[in-house]
From Swiss-Prot:
Binding site for Zn(2+): C197, C205, C208, C211
EC numbers on record: 6.3.4.20
Protein keywords: ATP-binding, Ligase, Metal-binding, Nucleotide-binding, Queuosine biosynthesis, Zinc
Biological-process GO terms, alphabetical: queuosine biosynthetic process
Biological classification of the source: Bacteria, Pseudomonadati, Bdellovibrionota, Bdellovibrionia, Bdellovibrionales
Catalytic activity: 7-carboxy-7-deazaguanine + NH4(+) + ATP = 7-cyano-7-deazaguanine + ADP + phosphate + H2O + H(+)
KW ATP-binding (keyword) present: yes
Pfam hit, one: QueC
Ligand binding (ATP): L11, S12, A13, G14, L15, D16, S17, T18, V19, N20, A21
Cofactor requirements of the protein: Zn(2+)
Protein name in the entry: 7-cyano-7-deazaguanine synthase
Amino acid sequence: MKKNKKVVVLLSAGLDSTVNAYEAIKHHHEIVLALTFNYGQRAAKKELEASANIAKHLGIPHKVVELPWFKDFNKSSLLVEDQAVPTGSAVEIDNQQKSEETAKSVWVPNRNGIFLNIAAAYAEALGADAVIPGFNAEEAATFPDNSREFLEQATKSLWYSTSNHVTVGCYTAHLKKPDIVRLGQGLKVPWELIWPCYFSGDKWCGQCESCLRSKRAFASANIDVKHLFKE
């Protein structure tokens, strides 16, 4: 993306979205709005709290969009309390077949597509040129709506559905988690503010797939955040 654009960022307070917000500022973009979605996810309480703190730290406008009807999609363990989120030994982040199986458990129908379209509507209304989500190459292998191809196709769709032809860009879509951590470290991201866990709690659980990927990424980058994990 060219520098000095007005942008809307999607901010879940996870590793990827937080680093993208910091990188957008580094590229001299004006973040006119940071959007966080409450769609009934298990980690909603912590995500909303952490996102607000990150936005405050960056000095950018922040808005929470309520999407209660996502609960109608009752097959995802991220939304349904009586369905177990895969954790611990049930998660093998280096096993592609196993990762595809666990991905099905936490998949929410068209979640990222809906998020991008809502963000694009805000972008057009606020005179912004682009929407910046937080994606990564590691999870794109099992979640196609994290891929660069998805970003490209979303931009093509928005050319027709927004009068100012809002684009979708992401600074981390080509990177794996360890490289995103290194990028964030260079940007001086305050890691204690992020929330990369599938659950709410006092600390990151350390056992869900998102935590296991984050744990490995921080270790690979030689950054000690053990105190932020429950286990």
